[in-house]
Amino acid sequence: MSTTVEKIKAIEDEMARTQKNKATSFHLGQLKAKLAKLRRELLTSASSGSGGGAGIGFDVARTGVASVGFVGFPSVGKSTLLSKLTGTESEAAEYEFTTLVTVPGVIRYKGAKIQMLDLPGIIDGAKDGRGRGKQVIAVARTCNLLFIILDVNKPLHHKQIIEKELEGVGIRLNKTPPDILIKKKEKGGISITNTVPLTHLGNDEIRAVMSEYRINSAEIAFRCDATVDDLIDVLEASSRRYMPAIYVLNKIDSLSIEELELLYRIPNAVPISSGQDWNLDELLQVMWDRLNLVRIYTKPKGQIPDFTDPVVLRSDRCSVKDFCNQIHKSLVDDFRNALVYGSSVKHQPQYVGLSHILEDEDVVTILKK
């Protein structure tokens, strides 16, 4: 583990010393690719157990339809926020390193059961295996949404450190995968096409990165103005995690109105005061929007719909088959068709099959054989 960390440090030092220009672009491309491979090595050893794994007390049994991880430095108010939202008591105090294990809680919001995980305070250097940060990050990667909780008295400083740590282990916040297609070939060399001008990336850098990954023949199609980091992300796709995140700017009760107005300009941010219960409703609504959950109401044949207890599905898994499996797996075996009311169908109601994609607040009657 220490050898990998030392190699990473050596490459970072060399990159810092190297001035970027046309003559050095090939060399810098190779260094960036080497760095990405070493970071993957570090992450793999941390998650497999040779470097500590998730660790006792870090990972917890999952429950609910989605999970939200609380990430932040010690004593920014994570434990207080968890307690206010879920009623779960996590030890909270005004000194650092209070929470030493992952503390789970559950909130029921708009009929959905959502698990919230108060992770131990992430610290600078976590991406290099220092402290307990790598175990915290291993759990954070498995969440559906991250609350990056910041103290408003020093938001930008801590925000930049946390983003750097998460970037270093392959977590991409509020981003989508780069639109780059790579098709490997047996021969013919590297051919590069682009549908938009590439203002951040030259052919030398592209060939250097591909060479480092031992890919000598491939067709590469750029459909976005990519950087060398974007190209590496596509090559390292299996170790990348694209996650929505909300920057929770806590302790706003210490600010003036003018200062508060400035905070609202930060993208993907929600200012709150967990201690004073300020703006928690807005935080939950933004959380709901970012989780992209779908509520489906059941309507037994010949009865009125049950609007009190929806079946909640993820937006990427919301077919009629997913709905049936959520209720009971035997429903799929006995399924004849479904009668759906709502925005997912043209006619009200309409008969559909198992592959039909449901939308939020549809009403469904399952008809058996």
UniProtKB/Swiss-Prot annotation:
SUPFAM superfamilies given in the database record: P-loop containing nucleoside triphosphate hydrolases, TGS-like
Cell location: Cytoplasm
Residues engaged in binding GTP: 72-79, 118-122, 250-253
Domain OBG-type G: from-to ranges: 66-292
Main location: cytoplasm
Residue ranges occupied by any TGS domain in the UniProt entry: 292-368
Database matches in CDD domains: DRG, TGS_DRG1
PROSITE patterns: G_OBG (PS51710), GTP1_OBG (PS00905), TGS (PS51880)
Pfam families: MMR_HSR1, MMR_HSR1_Xtn, TGS
GO BP term (any one): cytoplasmic translation
Domain of life: Eukaryota
Entry-annotated residues carrying N-acetylserine: 2
Annotated function: Involved in ribosomal function.
Subunit: Associates with translating polyribosomes. Interacts with GIR2, TMA46, YAP1 and YGR250C.
More info: Present with 11700 molecules/cell in log phase SD medium.
Protein name (record): Ribosome-interacting GTPase 1
Originating species: Saccharomyces cerevisiae (strain ATCC 204508 / S288c)
Source taxonomy: Eukaryota, Fungi, Dikarya, Ascomycota, Saccharomycotina
